[in-house]
UniProtKB/Swiss-Prot annotation:
One Gene Ontology term of the molecular function aspect: all-trans-retinol dehydrogenase (NAD+) activity
Cofactor note: Binds 2 Zn(2+) ions per subunit.
SUPFAM superfamilies (alphabetical): GroES-like (SSF50129), NAD(P)-binding Rossmann-fold domains (SSF51735)
Subunit structure: Homodimer.
Cofactor needs: Zn(2+)
Gene3D superfamilies with a match to the protein in the record: Medium-chain alcohol dehydrogenases, catalytic domain, NAD(P)-binding Rossmann-like Domain
Full protein name: Alcohol dehydrogenase 1
Gene (name only): ADH1
Amino acid sequence: MSTAGKVIKCKAAVLWEPKKPFSIEEVEVAPPKAHEVRIKILATGICRSDDHVITGALVRPFPIILGHEAAGVVESVGEGVTSVKPGDKVIPLFVPQCGECSACLSTKGNLCSKNDIGSASGLMPDGTTRFTCKGKAIHHFIGTSTFTEYTVVHETAVAKIAAAAPLEKVCLIGCGFSTGYGAAVQTAKVEPGSTCAVFGLGGVGLSVVMGCKAAGASRIIAIDINKDKFAKAKELGATDCVNPKDFTKPIHEVLMEMTGLGVDYSFEVIGHTETMAAALASCHFNYGVSVILGVPPAAEKISFDPMLLFSGRTWKGSVFGGWKSKDAVPKLVADYMEKKFVLEPLITHTLPFIKINEGFDLLRKGKSIRSVLVF
């Protein structure tokens, strides 16, 4: 029996307030309005950015359904939707691509003005929500909300992918892999023979390592305080692994000693202001490029010596790896299917959706790289 045009009741992980576990609830998911798509989520990854909302480092309205790295199948579409149809395999996009704003029209931009990353409204573009639970409206998360059996997204925030794609693997292209890999090949444009330093070896950081290797970097220094992550980093392309706890001097001084005048490219994939400054200071004084990928904590400010930039260094940010989402995601999935890169080493745990709290515990204890929840 078709569910198109009807409210769907399904299971979702609702976060009622910060610093509390998820609660598996029955929620009502309204039908898609014009230019919206309702998706049956089949696999979703657990990302550190979701945890930032739980801890309060990323401020969002509550109650909320988190999750933004996923893959699924279109259940129904609203009026005017032409890019996808029921039955299509898709990946929701937390960075939409409207094709009309200045960022979409620029060859240099990718952060579409239709995104809900900065405004943090927790609502669909029309200012309303499609989720209710126990009579209460539930907020969306950055236009995706994938910790639920069904979600609704705007047509600008969904990409059709290959019908043969394994969703429990390619869901990582919805955030972690694309964010890291793209920061190296798309944002920094790492050059062959260069030296790179990657601060933080979670799923995104390891994807940066993979991107640096693919770009032809000759030396990739992987940095983390958890030495258990070093074997995987080396497997994926790191040439050196450094634990800052093994040194009494600041990490940027260690890197300067290792490289002479600093690295060509550094990547901060943690989200701490002190490591952002350290990553900048570890770059070559004249032409080093440092890229921030880690989500900065709310309300924190950064202080640094402006001479670090005056001498010629470049400091830049990267959201979703600099990719234009609707254009890039189908191609990245196709590249994965053609074995141009691997995703399997990033996935350390596959859990049933109802074990979402266990998945977050693994993340916080540093025991997982990516946990994928399956429905």
